[in-house]
């Protein structure tokens, strides 16, 4: 074990399961594409060969058979090109896996050599990866329309740091893009497309996502009064779900008739409406009983029967749809739902946080007549580099528990001054010497100055303490 | 020894994921080759057909050959495809599944308040500014600051602290140490000053200019080395001189490595001189998180089996052993009676015998100040009046 008490290599691998989960899934998906492509071409070739076969039987159709054979060669040629593209994909993924293994082998070497400097540097790149992951997941994206490649600050960071092989940013940004479209632009298209491409996985899991997304599409059509399209949507997409979600579908159908009344007759006395609303909720607990938001809450509900349509029109549905999507997306690739960076920060803060954190000593300082002394003490003595006390980190530590300590961790030679402050006696003496040397104070040989309240004591006043 | 990494590396990455590791040939690669071979075969048969198409017998042979090679091709494609997917499945089962022993999400019990996340953004800004300002695109400071702002939204005020450092590092990496040497002189940093000159001498020798190197040592390093207190520095210089004498050189990679050491030393010194934190707070927190993770997952595993719950609400139920440089920021006093950390509400008190207890335990021992009590550590008797509130102060 080295001086950092860092976990072993295998533990690090487990912490970074997503670095291997994603490529493993990608390999399988790439294989699926490869296989599908081959199968479809194989069927086509089967047909072509059959025609060629009959053509060859007829000696008069010499030219035609040569032509057919040419066609076949062309088909095979195209197949080869398309397959080798997928094969290149495969090699890229495999290379990533190899680079990642190399990354952890590096760590293994540093750990084996107990090389703390190198280990710290390695952990810095590890931190950078977590930051990159966070930025890619949440950054706002810009799309390069020429190459159709989305980018954001996270990807920029990955590229400047040369971390491309250690993080599957393409996957993360796909989730980010779909989710941003949902939340920011209320655009369902990318989500529906994704659902279609991954329907096998979703049905296997028995996910509600597809139904909820289609339902939302229908609701939006109703909202913009395109009833024809809404009915078409209901018939083609939603009707299959009649057995699984009968209640929701009844509501959805009802909304078509009552949507206008939901919006128009809302204004008379709000309070009683709200009471009715709650009453209705308890009678029919089909959705989460949260207050209706924004537009809908003010004007929906004239009578209690209508208010049950409220949740369908609620804009919070977008939020929950987004959450549902992210859950499905991340579970598909076995990526953690919460941002890894936040998880590490939460654990890190809790491991570090002492009861003293956030209580700055500078507030207790009593100023000295010489401002230089104050300045020196402020920046050199009481200033702590404690990461939890850092002004950006401390607010994050708000709800997090403190570290648990079983032993006191103090300092050598504790002595108490008459004012009750306990210091390391040697450090206190050397501090006073330094202040004298710099000409800030004129202390006598056996005198020290308490840096907090600036009172001066003789070293003979020191009381040796026995804290346990 | 790490078993997972070894399996991943030896058994899979270096063999089983490939048909031939040295050529980086995979099963799918084999498929592509088979398609190619098939195409060539078809072309050959086409040539035959063109040449001998008129003879019915030959036509028959060609027909059969075509059918046969199509059939063979199809079956070998299927075979390769099957072994490809089964390799992946085995890989996933043997290598990837064991990594999923626990879920990262499962230890995320104490959540960070989402309303405070904009503070995290600033922490990220500071992190990037501290370590990577020198990678910002641009030739002038202004361009670099603009780049950092437009790419990461890092405000000028944060990046400003590091821009001088970044410029010096940039110069150092481009082979010009002069600004850094001047900076060292201004700040009286003898050791780094020496290291930089030494680096210059090294690079002269690696460029195969022994005479220049010798003269450089004479003018720039000799005076420092001759000081008797700097024996430590004499050793590398004498090694360099010896290399000159025997006509040896230094590989460029060594010079680069030493340059990085110097950059690291310089940034450290720069932060010290300018009262900037040595490491970004975010980095230290994440590092503590990695170290703590092992205990959290262990606790989570035990909790699952034994149905114990996360006991104390505001304190972790276990101790995380952090390295000294991460655990010495604040003095921690654990009351020896209550075994609790002292706080503002429950501060430490000194007894007349100079043992220290927390206020709560003092109240308990003295029955709220109504009676005398014996110090739990020595025979001295005490009363509450005789105790004195103390505070522990850590000096750097």
Swiss-Prot record, chain A:
It holds the Pfam family CTLH. A zinc finger (RING-Gid-type) spans 386-453. GO terms for cellular component: cytoplasm; GID complex; nucleus. The keyword Metal-binding applies. GO terms for biological process: negative regulation of gluconeogenesis; proteasome-mediated ubiquitin-dependent protein catabolic process. Involved in the proteasome-dependent degradation of fructose-1,6-bisphosphatase. This is Protein FYV10. The gene is FYV10.
């Amino acid at each position: 074990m080295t001086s950092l008490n860092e976990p072993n290599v295998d533990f690090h691998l487990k912490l970074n399961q997503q670095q291997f989960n994603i490529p493993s899934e990608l390999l399988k998906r790439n294989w699926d594409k490869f296989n599908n492509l081959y199968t479809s071409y194989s069927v086509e070739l089967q047909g072509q060969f059959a025609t060629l076969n009959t053509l060859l039987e007829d000696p008069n159709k010499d030219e035609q058979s040569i032509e057919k054979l040419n066609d076949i060669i062309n088909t095979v040629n195209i197949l080869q090109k398309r397959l080798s593209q997928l094969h290149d994909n495969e090699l890229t993924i495999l290379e990533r896996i190899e680079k990642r293994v190399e990354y952890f082998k590096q760590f293994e070497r540093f750990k084996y050599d107990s090389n703390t400097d190198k280990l710290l540097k390695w952990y810095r790149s590890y931190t950078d990866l977590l930051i990159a992951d966070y930025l890619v997941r949440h950054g706002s994206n810009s799309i390069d329309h020429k190459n159709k490649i989305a980018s954001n600050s996270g990807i920029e960071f990955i590229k400047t740091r040369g971390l491309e092989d250690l993080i599957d940013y393409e996957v993360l940004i796909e989730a980010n893009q779909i989710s941003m479209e949902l939340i920011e632009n209320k655009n369902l298209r990318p989500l529906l497309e994704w659902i279609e491409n991954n329907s096998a996985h979703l049905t296997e899991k028995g996910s509600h996502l597809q139904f909820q997304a289609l339902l939302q599409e229908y609701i939006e059509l109703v909202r913009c009064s395109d009833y024809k399209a809404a009915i078409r949507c209901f018939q083609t997409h939603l009707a299959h779900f009649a057995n699984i979600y009968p209640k929701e579908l009844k509501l959805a159908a009802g909304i078509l008739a009552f949507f206008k009344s939901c919006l128009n007759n809302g204004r008379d006395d709000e309070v009683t409406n709200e009471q009715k609303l709650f009453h209705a909720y308890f009678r029919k607990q089909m959705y989460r009983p949260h207050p209706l938001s924004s537009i809908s809450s003010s004007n929906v509900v004239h009578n209690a029967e209508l208010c049950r349509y409220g949740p369908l029109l609620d804009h919070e549905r977008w939020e929950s749809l987004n959450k549902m999507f992210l859950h499905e997306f991340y579970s598909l690739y076995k990526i953690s739902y919460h941002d890894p960076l936040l998880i590490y920060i939460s654990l890190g803060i809790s491991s570090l946080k002492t009861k003293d954190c956030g209580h700055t000593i500078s507030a207790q300082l009593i100023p000295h007549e010489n401002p230089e002394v104050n300045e020196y003490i402020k920046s050199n003595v009481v200033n702590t580099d404690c990461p939890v006390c850092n002004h950006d980190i401390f607010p994050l530590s708000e709800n997090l528990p403190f570290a648990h300590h079983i032993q006191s961790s103090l300092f050598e030679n504790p002595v108490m001054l008459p004012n009750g402050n306990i210091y390391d006696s040697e450090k206190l003496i050397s501090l006073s010497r330094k202040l004298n040397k710099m000409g800030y104070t004129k202390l006598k040989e056996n005198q020290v100055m308490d840096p907090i309240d600036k009172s001066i004591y003789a070293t003979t006043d020191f009381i040796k303490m026995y804290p346990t | 020894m790490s078993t997972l990494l070894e399996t991943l590396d030896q058994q899979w990455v270096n063999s089983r994921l490939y048909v031939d590791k040295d050529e980086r040939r995979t099963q799918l690669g084999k498929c592509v080759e088979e398609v190619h071979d098939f195409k060539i075969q078809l072309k050959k048969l086409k040539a035959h057909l063109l040449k001998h198409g008129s003879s019915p017998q030959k036509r028959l042979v060609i027909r059969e050959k075509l059918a046969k090679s199509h059939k063979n091709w199809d079956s070998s494609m299927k075979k390769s495809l099957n072994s490809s997917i089964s390799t992946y499945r085995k890989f996933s089962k043997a290598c990837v599944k064991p990594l999923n022993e626990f879920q990262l999400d499962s230890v995320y019990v104490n959540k960070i308040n989402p309303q405070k996340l904009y503070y995290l953004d600033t922490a990220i800004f500071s992190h990037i500014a501290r370590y990577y300002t020198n990678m910002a695109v641009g030739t002038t400071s202004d361009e670099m600051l603009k780049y950092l702002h437009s790419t990461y939204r890092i405000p000028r005020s944060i990046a400003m602290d590091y821009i001088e450092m970044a410029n010096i590092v940039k110069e150092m990496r481009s082979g010009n140490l002069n600004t850094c040497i001047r900076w060292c002189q201004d700040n009286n940093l003898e050791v780094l000053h020496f290291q930089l000159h030494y680096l210059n001498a090294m690079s002269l020798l690696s460029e195969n200019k022994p005479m220049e190197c010798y003269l450089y040592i004479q003018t720039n390093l000799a005076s420092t080395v001759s000081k008797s207190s700097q024996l430590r520095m004499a050793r590398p210089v004498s090694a360099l001189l010896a290399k000159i004498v025997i006509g040896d050189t230094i590989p460029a990679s060594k010079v680069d490595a030493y340059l990085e050491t110097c950059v690291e030393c310089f940034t450290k010194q720069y932060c010290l001189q300018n009262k900037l934190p040595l490491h970004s707070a975010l980095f230290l927190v994440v590092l503590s998180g990695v170290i703590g993770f092992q205990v959290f997952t262990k606790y989570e595993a035990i909790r699952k089996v034994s149905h114990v719950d996360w006991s104390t609400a505001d304190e972790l139920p276990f101790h995380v052993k952090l390295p000294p440089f991460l655990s010495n920021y604040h003095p921690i006093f654990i009351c020896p009676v209550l075994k609790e950390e002292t706080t503002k509400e429950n501060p430490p008190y000194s007894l007349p015998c100079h043992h220290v207890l927390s206020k709560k335990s003092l109240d308990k021992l003295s029955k709220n100040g109504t009676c005398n009590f014996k110090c739990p550590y020595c025979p001295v008797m005490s009363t509450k009046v005789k105790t004195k509130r103390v505070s522990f102060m850590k000096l750097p």
